Amino acid sequence: MPRKTLIFGNGLGMALDPRHFSLTNAMAEVWNDPFAISDVHKDLISQCLGGNGAIPQREDQLDPLHLVISACRTLSSINMSQRMNVHWLSQEGQHFPVAVGNYIHKVATRLHMYGGSLPQAFLEPLIGFVRHTKSHVATLNYDKLLYGAFLDAGLMAGYFHTTLVDGMVGNGFSSQALERLYNNTFGYYLHLHGSPLFFDHHGLARKRDRHELNPFSPEGSDHIVLTHVRHKRSVIGASMVLSAYWNYLNFSLNESEEIIVFGYSGDDEHLNDVIAAHGQSKHIVIVEWDGLDQTEQQRLWYWSQKFKSNNFHLWRLPNVLTFTQWDHVY
């Protein structure tokens, strides 16, 4: 059976536990954790969001925050390159990008650390399909729902005799570990928006084991995408890991017979552009929750605008976790 590419959004987690997997809830709970971020940095972040005690609740609020971080990094680099005795920034300003990075990392960590699991009635046909076809899997969310289940099922078992690889090896991330050599035919597991398991160590991106991640893990990283949609491309471009994943997304879509988009809002224009580029020649299957208070015609029009194509099939379900038609031919 030919390969497909399966792209999973946050609707996967929301179908299981909407309270835990709500980004708004995660951002608020980390903000209110007295050990997650200092009061000084909270004040600075609030000022970026408009002042008056404003707190981050949505990705689209993070536009000015990203601009301030970029400015701080630029001024710090000028100071370092010219060996100035006086810094452009205060101590708080110098530490601000790190503090925000740690906050974002802790939000992703909270979403990742979930004690439940996907129902077996959903997982078993999905795992069986991926194992049989070596179809590619790409995730936009930070949780371990699929990643943990795939590891436990033995789908990601090293370079040889494996179903999927993500480029993370013992010494850290290597794009060479994504190359198919020695007649390998594996598929790809692409963390498109990163993972809180990723951290930088002596200039190399590495990945923790699942049991090593906890709410007090200190390291933020540049390998998590949590920002206003207009800045997501630049965050991806600044990370060697994420850039490689997006390059391989194009490769994966190119060799796939079909694209299945599961639990995705349609809000990430950088992803929509990639799907649209392949959607003229590939059939797209969209699986979404039917509780959006819109008619089927409205949703068909919505997706045709997002993917610049009418070559798609739309599944609208009361519970997306009842979907098992991974191998269906349209």
For each of these PLM feature ranges, what is it?
Residues 5-9, 136-141, 158-161, 188-193, ...:
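A structural signal for short, well-ordered beta-strand segments and their strand-loop junctions
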Residues 1-135, 140-148:
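Gly/serine-rich nucleotide phosphate-binding loop at the start of the catalytic core
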Residues 178-210:
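A recognition module on extended beta-rich or small alphabeta surfaces enriched in W/G with H and D/E
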Residues 148-151, 200-209, 271-273:
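A short secondary-structure junction signal
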Residues 203-250:
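Flexible internal linker/loop segments at domain or repeat junctions
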Residues 153-168, 263:
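A short alpha->loop->secondary-structure connector
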